[in-house]
Design a protein with these regions (language model features):
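Low-complexity, Gly/Ser/Thr/Pro-rich intrinsically disordered linker/tail segments
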Residues: 107-110, 114-115, 123-158
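Acidic/His-rich structured neighborhood in mature extracellular/periplasmic domains
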Residues: 1-81, 92, 100, 104-105, ...
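Glycine-rich catalytic cores of cysteine/serine-nucleophile enzymes that process amide/ester linkages
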Residues: 81-131
Length: 158
């Protein structure tokens, strides 16, 4: 399994926004068929409503992600983006892993397929949440909710 610390159930998937990811996975032979299917399920679009109310969208994302079993020590932090190009949906626009270190937390992320992974050290989880919130705050548009952060299956509220 490509993500050893997350149990991914067999769910219906909507991988329509994952064409770039799946192309890179196929070209790089990154995953076998089973792992690619799990990837597509975890990062599926989630249906939502036409509202700018982040609470509404966060509740939908919490419900979706509650079907997965996450590791509490290696936390999946996700930036969730609202999209209305083909119906109202939510998708994980960026993801990284947060792990405790001796004097804080280490956040590991990959910004693009072409760039190497990067690791950033934070004193607190909240500092990492703020970093993500600030970095992705403009990934929105007119009539759309602002991006929000999920820590495993829980909405991070500031």
């Amino acid at each position: 399994m490509f993500i050893k610390n997350i149990e991914i159930p067999k769910l219906e998937k909507d991988d329509s926004l994952l064409f770039v990811d799946n192309d890179a996975i196929d070209k790089g032979k990154v995953f076998g068929a089973e792992d690619k299917d799990a990837f597509d399920i975890l990062f599926s679009r989630v249906k939502t409503e036409a509202t700018t109310d982040v609470k509404v969208h966060a509740a939908k994302m919490e419900q979706f992600l509650s079907q997965f079993k996450f590791n509490e020590n290696a936390r999946m932090l996700s930036v969730v983006v609202h999209d209305d190009l083909d119906g109202q949906s939510l998708f994980i626009g960026h993801v990284g892993i947060l792990v405790p270190s001796e004097d804080g937390y280490l956040f590991v992320e990959k910004l693009t397929f072409e760039e190497p992974y990067q690791a950033i050290k934070f004193a607190t989880k909240e500092d990492c949440y703020k970093y993500l919130d600030t970095k992705y705050e403009n990934y929105t548009g007119e009539g759309l909710a602002k991006p929000f952060i999920m820590d495993n299956d829980k909405w991070v509220q500031f």
